[in-house]
Design a protein with these regions (language model features):
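Compositionally biased alpha-helical segments
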Residues: 1-198
């Protein structure tokens, strides 16, 4: 599966939520035509990719090619199985999410114009992470921060997982981090989204 030109945008539905952004297959973007069960299909001709369980209980995937106004909807569906280990969604102003095969439900291809893509001006000079740390005893310390000993600039990323869904979030998009327990923390983003990551 591959785009003919440029990047491909989509909305991914998983067992834990819906994500919208630039789509990558199996941790890499496809940019050339690829054979699939002896059928050549460009990604920009695909409308949906959906997951279902095969006879052996494993997740497999089917494709529904894009329907043009002159097509007969009855002929629109082609059941082509395609192995997908994961789908990564690069979301502007949030970060990237990697959805595993087990938690993937559906991908819908959308026009890239529906995304608010970042421009060169959205990437200023690197800034140190600044903030406040509140201890369990109530003490507050303010200044430059180094998260996990080595992340000290806003362009560096916080890596976390929830089940088998992986997140990579630049610190510039994070508002606060609060411990939930010894395994997970609550992450609040600047757009007010909240995540529980371990």
């Amino acid at each position: 599966i591959a785009p003919e030109t440029n990047q491909v945008a989509g909305t991914v539905k998983s067992t834990q939520g819906i994500y919208k952004g630039i789509i990558y297959w199996n941790s890499q973007q496809r940019q050339s035509q690829e054979k699939m069960n002896q059928i050549n299909i460009f990604l920009n001709k695909i409308k949906k990719l959906y997951a279902f369980k095969g006879k052996n209980g494993n997740h497999t995937f089917g494709l529904i090619p894009l329907v043009s106004p002159n097509d007969d909807p009855a002929d629109a569906q082609i059941n082509v199985l395609y192995p997908v280990e994961n789908i990564t969604i690069n979301m502007p102003n949030i970060g990237s999410v990697c959805v595993s095969r087990a938690q993937f439900e559906e991908l819908t291809i959308i026009p890239i114009s529906e995304l608010n893509l970042l421009s060169y001006d959205d990437f200023p000079s690197p800034q140190a992470i600044k903030g406040e740390v509140v201890t369990r005893s109530g003490q507050t310390f303010a200044g430059n921060l180094a998260y996990d000993l080595d992340e000290s600039y806003e362009f560096e990323v916080l890596d976390g997982k929830n089940n088998t869904i992986s997140y990579r979030i630049p610190f510039r998009y994070i508002r606060s981090i609060a411990p939930k327990n010894y395994k997970y923390s609550f992450i609040t983003l600047r757009n007010n989204s909240q995540l529980s990551l371990g």
